[in-house]
Amino acid sequence: MKALLVLACGALTAASTQAASSGPDVVVLPGGDSKARPEDCRAILVGPGTNQPDPFPGYGGFVGWESPVRLKCGDWLVGFNAGYWHASPPTPWHYPAKALQEYLKLGLPAGIVAPTGGRAMIIRSTDEGKTWSKPVTLIDTPADDRHPAFVELRDRTVLCSFFTYMGEPEGGVWSDPAMETRVHLIRSFDGGRTWEKKPLLLHTPFTYDETDGPLVKLKDGSVLIAINGRPRSGPPDQAAVMRSTNRGRSWKLLGAIRAAHDLQEVTVAELPGGEWVMMARPEGDICWSRDKGRTWTEPVTFGMRMLAPSLYVLRDGTLLCLHGSYTRGGLRVMFSRNGGHTWIAPGKDFGFLVDQSYGYGKAMELPDGSLFITYLATGGHHTPDAQSNAIRCIRLRVRPDYSGIDLLPAPNRGHVAPIP
């Protein structure tokens, strides 16, 4: 996010590492892709002609960076970013002249008026995804509010993380630290209908930081957030894990992870045996912690270059990784039956196809064992794509014999009207 073109195509001391781990194996499984086609299963939650947000200063048709959650009451929520482009910082823009010209050439729409940039919005379904409410504002700070993600706690508090983006500074460093890209959190105490007005700033050891979610509720009821950011010593970007034991009021840094290259868009999960696993963009680095995040194995790659990985542990213990693929494109998925040490996929360097889209998929497991997945159609880099972007959804099931995946119809196929 610090340099948007990457998305288009005191020093921090990292936590000590556990014994280095060899890279995971990939078991290639021919015939494991779904027989049902994505276009026969997907539906649109928000997009052209479907449940668009009401106009606001700075809205130009872009929607994306979304995430779902299923609440204990049965309601489903999907949060997303709405703005005018792939990134929607407030105007007047804060970009170095060269970067601004590159972004305008790429498709940043000239002449936009967006006093507070993009905002985070939310929709709700009370009938298991068949119909959805009109989008309403979740949070609108002075910055672009990106990648809202959720977790519901034991007491039904709903915690939401997001990060803010103001643009890019001359020379790479803002003179005003308040302009930096930063992770924030807000809470709801009524099932996501109202939210705290003043976000909590996550204090990290980085000069800037980001998170895409998902937040992770641990077996003991505490919550993890995985972030990436720039250490004060300079690049490459590192990953870190923080934990809250008091419903998101405060957060403690557990450990940081570094490699010889950037670790971005990091994701973490708790395995059935209590071990934690983390993955990151762009090289698909994976590492594990056996001591609750204090130390981590050395990050290793295994040929799966990916963007926006998201890890989920299913009820049967299967570890699933949604990701965008650098080698084949599209939103894809692979899964593991042994905590990420062996992955099942259709190829050594790509997962099973979910849809030929830009990716950035997030998921939630449903009572029937299938996954409800939300994702965006395009990255919104080109102006026409930004003006007509859509948030899609689909369902997916790992086959009972683990021979691959099956795509299933989205709950709202044929249901497009928002609920009152």
Language-model features: where?
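Asp-box/BNR beta-propeller blade signature and adjacent active/binding-site loops
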Residues: 21-420
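Boundary at the C-terminal end of the N-terminal hydrophobic targeting segment
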Residues: 14-22
